[in-house]
Regions:
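A short, hydrophobic C-terminal helix/tail in secreted or cell-surface proteins
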Residues: 266-270
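Extended, highly charged
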Residues: 1-265
């Protein structure tokens, strides 16, 4: 199922009684993480903190959602399946179609053709993530949690990090835990064997990076999937959502990012 935006998925959780709203202020340092930890361990619902309190005592303008995919049922709901192996079966049918069956009954191949067409991303001029442009961004004002006492600081735990090969321009989207170092500085935890690290190593100068927040479920799951090199995360997101993923160009660099994001930070890797 193509959710298109995270807001649609969160609304579906609320409609089905799977979302807990917390209207009172909750600290992003440790307190919010404690709520989420207890919910995960007891198979509880997703939780939305409407007034996340930042370390300086102020209330963030943005809410904080946690435990969105914390149960098997919610994960299946996010992916639009009853069983996760449905996705694998669809992949197999695309890679090894029943040619004989299609020749005998050509109409049975229509669904397969539509499935394949859904994988090609669609470029659009503007996305939701560009409706408001902040000229002087400060990531410390975002409701980024510190979830464990011994953590080195506050971390974005579900960031969609987009990079490109400096020679071929081929994009990669990975989910790399990002530590807040300052108002305009994040530390990206990409291991040596990840494509993001490959792109950084191959770059002789500052490398453009897009750090994206609040993507729809099909994009989040695609970003963490171990895909072959000839299948992009954007194509796989289209397969998961059964609909072409809309992508748009960043404002300050040439990277293409999902258009339905809540927040995108155009950055550079040093």
């Amino acid at each position: 199922m193509a959710w298109r935006t995270l807001a649609r998925y969160v609304q579906s959780l609320e409609d089905s009684g799977e979302l807990i709203r917390v209207a009172d202020p909750v600290d992003v340092e440790l307190e919010a993480g404690c709520f989420a930890d207890r919910l995960v361990k007891r198979g509880g619902g997703a939780i939305l903190f409407e007034q996340p309190r930042l370390p300086d005592g102020s209330i963030s303008d943005l809410p904080l959602a946690m435990n969105l995919f914390g149960t098997r049922d919610r994960t299946n709901h996010a992916l639009g399946v009853k069983r996760p192996d449905e996705i694998g079966n669809r992949m197999v049918s695309l890679m090894k179609p029943d040619i004989g069956g299609i020749m005998k009954a050509p109409w049975t191949g229509i669904g397969l053709a539509l499935e394949g067409m859904s994988m090609a991303p669609m470029k659009v001029r503007k996305g939701a993530c560009q409706q408001i442009v902040i000229k002087d961004p400060d990531v410390t004002k975002l409701p980024i949690p510190k979830t464990w006492p011994e953590d080195g600081g506050r971390y974005i735990t579900l960031p969609l990090v987009v990079t490109a090969d400096p020679e071929t321009g081929v994009h990669n989207m990975g989910m790399y835990r990002s530590q807040v170092f300052g108002p305009k500085e994040l530390g990206l935890h990409w291991q040596a064997h990840k494509h993001g690290a490959d792109h950084a190593d191959a770059s002789k100068d500052r490398m453009p990076v897009a750090i994206c927040l609040g993507g729809p479920p099909e994009v989040m799951f695609s970003s963490i999937s171990p895909l072959p090199d000839n299948l992009s995360e954007y194509e796989f997101a289209g397969l998961l959502g059964k609909r072409r993923l809309r992508i748009t160009k960043c404002i300050t660099n040439e990277l293409m990012v999902p258009a339905g994001l809540l927040y995108t930070s155009d950055a550079a890797d040093d």
